[in-house]
Amino acid sequence: MADKLFSIRNYFFLGSYQSCIGEALKFSSKNEEEKQEKDVYLYRSYIAQGQAFIPLKEIPAATKSADLAAVRRYAEFRNNPAAKKKILAEVQEEVASRNIKSEIAAVLAATILNEADLSQDAFRAVSRFEGLEARASKVFILIKMNKRKLAIGEVKKMNQIDEDATLSQLANALVTSFGASGKVKDALYIYSEMSDKYGRTTDLEMHQAVVSILTQDYAAAEELLESALERDNKDADVLINSIVSAQLNEKDDDVVERFISQLKHEHPNHPWVIDFNEKEAEFDRVASDSRA
């Protein structure tokens, strides 16, 4: 039986959000579960594009769907800075009480906690769930926590479910990127194959650039990041890696400063920006004390 939602999900996982939206808007089904799943990826794509106001407007606050309620809460988290602290506390309470009702809700809870740089809580959010998206979330979190061996274990479980699935391939590429130096280029082959098969996306080019940096091919990294920026010049990960690439390619200081300024402007609450601002303030304090 054909998977009617395959293209919608696949475009989302690849970071091709406009294509996901296009497929979702064309989608037609009488099955309520299919329509709801379509809406989940449609609205998550709008959020990823910085248009969180759309799900906030279209998903009723009193929706009975646990998945859509989780999407709406994530949209509120991204759209309303004043609500972030309250939402974060609410998510942490749900994780602590094991009161997360669905895999999508768990993945979105983990996403919120990750964005708050609370990796351990994020892992707890998805720990009970065994679907591919939950396991892919675990892999990302474990790599972020520098626990590659555990991440490999999750990838093996994903491969047992479906080794050809896009999420399994992306998870394989991620753990390979941070493995033995002799195998890092294997990750580049995976990303390149996916680009050839499904088309280039901001996410795929960003990951290819990271592998290029790890293999010291700085010119290739710069080219890939420039292409990614043409697609989305506000993406936080692309901007962060552009800062790294500019420094490695020995660009003028004003180029690096421009990327930093843009990142600060677009993502003032990003963990990288918060850490940078703290270090910058500490440097200024030490410099001021030394002049006193």
Swiss-Prot record:
Listed under GO cellular component are:
COPI vesicle coat; Golgi membrane; mitochondrion
List, alphabetically, the InterPro entries matched. Answer: Coatomer_esu, TPR-like_helical_dom_sf
Extract the GO molecular function terms from the UniProt entry: structural molecule activity
Annotated membrane topology is: Peripheral membrane protein
- Any Pfam family matching the protein: Coatomer_E
| Subcellular location(s) per record | Cytoplasm; Golgi apparatus membrane; Cytoplasmic vesicle, COPI-coated vesicle membrane
Give the record's GO biological process terms: endoplasmic reticulum to Golgi vesicle-mediated transport; intra-Golgi vesicle-mediated transport; protein transport; retrograde vesicle-mediated transport, Golgi to endoplasmic reticulum
The family line of this record is: Belongs to the COPE family.
Quaternary structure, from the entry: Oligomeric complex that consists of at least the alpha, beta, beta', gamma, delta, epsilon and zeta subunits.
UniProt name for this protein: Coatomer subunit epsilon
Organism of provenance: Caenorhabditis elegans
Q: Which gene encodes it?
A: cope-1
